[in-house]
Amino acid sequence: MALLIKKSRLPGAGKGLYTTKAIRKDARIIEYRGEIIGNSEYRRRTRREEDQYLFYLRRDLCIDALHTPQYKARYANDAAGITRMKGIRNNSDYMTFGDKCFIVASRDIKAGEEIFVNYTKSYWDSMRKRMKKRKKAATQKKR
Protein backbone atom coordinates (compact mmCIF):
# COMPACT_ATOMS: atom_id res chain seq x y z
CA MET A 1 0.00 0.00 0.00
CA ALA A 2 1.36 3.44 -0.91
CA LEU A 3 0.97 5.55 2.23
CA LEU A 4 2.53 8.81 3.38
CA ILE A 5 2.59 10.98 6.47
CA LYS A 6 1.72 14.68 6.31
CA LYS A 7 -0.24 17.30 8.29
CA SER A 8 -3.70 16.05 9.22
CA ARG A 9 -6.84 17.81 8.01
CA LEU A 10 -8.13 17.73 11.60
CA PRO A 11 -7.19 20.88 13.55
CA GLY A 12 -4.72 20.12 16.34
CA ALA A 13 -4.30 16.47 15.33
CA GLY A 14 -0.71 16.83 14.17
CA LYS A 15 0.33 14.38 11.48
CA GLY A 16 -2.03 12.15 9.52
CA LEU A 17 -1.83 9.02 7.40
CA TYR A 18 -2.72 9.41 3.70
CA THR A 19 -3.03 7.01 0.80
CA THR A 20 -1.55 7.81 -2.60
CA LYS A 21 -3.59 5.07 -4.31
CA ALA A 22 -7.27 4.13 -4.21
CA ILE A 23 -8.16 1.49 -1.61
CA ARG A 24 -11.14 -0.84 -1.93
CA LYS A 25 -13.57 -1.48 0.92
CA ASP A 26 -12.44 -4.37 3.19
CA ALA A 27 -8.78 -4.11 2.06
CA ARG A 28 -6.12 -4.34 4.75
CA ILE A 29 -4.44 -0.95 4.58
CA ILE A 30 -1.56 -1.41 7.03
CA GLU A 31 -0.55 -3.44 10.06
CA TYR A 32 -0.53 -1.59 13.40
CA ARG A 33 2.94 -2.37 14.71
CA GLY A 34 4.93 -1.48 17.79
CA GLU A 35 6.31 -2.94 20.99
CA ILE A 36 4.39 -6.01 22.21
CA ILE A 37 3.63 -5.76 25.94
CA GLY A 38 1.64 -7.72 28.52
CA ASN A 39 -1.40 -6.67 30.53
CA SER A 40 0.47 -5.45 33.64
CA GLU A 41 2.74 -3.23 31.51
CA TYR A 42 -0.33 -2.00 29.59
CA ARG A 43 -1.96 -0.92 32.88
CA ARG A 44 1.26 0.80 34.02
CA ARG A 45 1.59 2.72 30.76
CA THR A 46 -2.05 3.84 30.68
CA ARG A 47 -1.46 5.62 34.00
CA ARG A 48 1.28 7.81 32.48
CA GLU A 49 0.51 11.37 31.49
CA GLU A 50 1.84 11.26 27.93
CA ASP A 51 0.59 10.49 24.45
CA GLN A 52 -0.62 6.96 23.99
CA TYR A 53 -0.47 4.68 21.00
CA LEU A 54 -1.75 1.55 22.74
CA PHE A 55 -3.87 -1.11 21.07
CA TYR A 56 -5.30 -3.86 23.27
CA LEU A 57 -5.18 -7.09 21.22
CA ARG A 58 -6.60 -9.40 23.85
CA ARG A 59 -6.67 -9.92 27.61
CA ASP A 60 -2.90 -10.45 27.94
CA LEU A 61 -1.41 -8.74 24.88
CA CYS A 62 -1.07 -5.14 23.71
CA ILE A 63 0.77 -3.19 21.01
CA ASP A 64 2.42 0.10 22.03
CA ALA A 65 3.54 2.25 19.08
CA LEU A 66 4.61 5.27 21.17
CA HIS A 67 8.34 4.78 20.58
CA THR A 68 8.08 3.40 17.04
CA PRO A 69 7.48 6.44 14.79
CA GLN A 70 8.79 4.47 11.81
CA TYR A 71 5.51 2.48 11.72
CA LYS A 72 3.02 4.57 9.76
CA ALA A 73 -0.24 3.10 11.13
CA ARG A 74 0.15 5.10 14.36
CA TYR A 75 -0.50 8.30 12.37
CA ALA A 76 -4.11 7.39 11.47
CA ASN A 77 -6.41 9.84 13.30
CA ASP A 78 -9.98 9.47 14.53
CA ALA A 79 -12.42 11.78 12.72
CA ALA A 80 -14.98 11.19 15.51
CA GLY A 81 -12.68 12.26 18.34
CA ILE A 82 -12.57 15.47 20.38
CA THR A 83 -11.80 17.66 17.33
CA ARG A 84 -14.28 17.06 14.52
CA MET A 85 -14.82 18.66 11.13
CA LYS A 86 -18.06 18.68 9.22
CA GLY A 87 -18.00 16.21 6.33
CA ILE A 88 -15.03 14.20 7.61
CA ARG A 89 -15.84 10.69 8.81
CA ASN A 90 -13.87 7.58 9.69
CA ASN A 91 -13.20 5.42 6.63
CA SER A 92 -11.54 2.43 8.27
CA ASP A 93 -11.55 0.20 11.35
CA TYR A 94 -9.03 -1.65 13.47
CA MET A 95 -9.34 -5.41 13.00
CA THR A 96 -7.38 -8.15 14.71
CA PHE A 97 -6.21 -11.30 12.98
CA GLY A 98 -4.60 -13.59 15.53
CA ASP A 99 -1.88 -11.61 17.31
CA LYS A 100 -1.82 -8.85 14.71
CA CYS A 101 -3.87 -5.72 14.21
CA PHE A 102 -4.61 -4.08 10.87
CA ILE A 103 -6.35 -0.94 9.73
CA VAL A 104 -9.00 -2.13 7.26
CA ALA A 105 -11.00 0.08 4.86
CA SER A 106 -14.68 0.33 5.86
CA ARG A 107 -15.50 1.95 2.51
CA ASP A 108 -13.74 2.67 -0.78
CA ILE A 109 -11.05 5.31 -0.17
CA LYS A 110 -9.86 7.61 -2.94
CA ALA A 111 -6.22 8.36 -3.70
CA GLY A 112 -5.09 11.37 -1.66
CA GLU A 113 -7.56 10.81 1.19
CA GLU A 114 -6.53 10.78 4.82
CA ILE A 115 -7.06 7.49 6.65
CA PHE A 116 -9.38 7.90 9.66
CA VAL A 117 -10.04 5.10 12.15
CA ASN A 118 -12.22 4.80 15.28
CA TYR A 119 -10.16 4.92 18.50
CA THR A 120 -13.17 3.74 20.61
CA LYS A 121 -15.25 5.50 23.25
CA SER A 122 -13.04 4.24 26.10
CA TYR A 123 -9.98 5.89 24.50
CA TRP A 124 -11.73 9.27 24.27
CA ASP A 125 -13.18 8.96 27.80
CA SER A 126 -9.63 8.39 29.05
CA MET A 127 -8.34 11.38 27.06
CA ARG A 128 -11.07 13.67 28.44
CA LYS A 129 -10.20 12.61 32.00
CA ARG A 130 -6.52 13.28 31.37
CA MET A 131 -7.28 16.71 29.88
CA LYS A 132 -9.46 17.63 32.89
CA LYS A 133 -6.70 16.51 35.25
CA ARG A 134 -4.09 18.63 33.41
CA LYS A 135 -6.40 21.65 33.37
CA LYS A 136 -7.07 21.30 37.11
CA ALA A 137 -3.34 20.98 37.85
CA ALA A 138 -2.59 24.08 35.74
CA THR A 139 -5.30 26.06 37.56
CA GLN A 140 -3.93 25.04 40.97
CA LYS A 141 -0.39 26.04 39.91
CA LYS A 142 -1.59 29.58 39.14
CA ARG A 143 -2.89 30.06 42.70
Q: What are these regions, as identified by a protein language model?
A:
Residues S8-T19:
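Short aromatic-glycine motifs in intrinsically disordered, low-complexity regions
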Residues K25, I82, T139-R143:
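Polybasic, lysine-enriched low-complexity intrinsically disordered terminal tails
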Residues G34-I36, G81:
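Acidic glycine-/aspartate-rich tracts in secreted/extracellular proteins
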Residues I37-Q52, S126-R143:
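Short, compositionally biased
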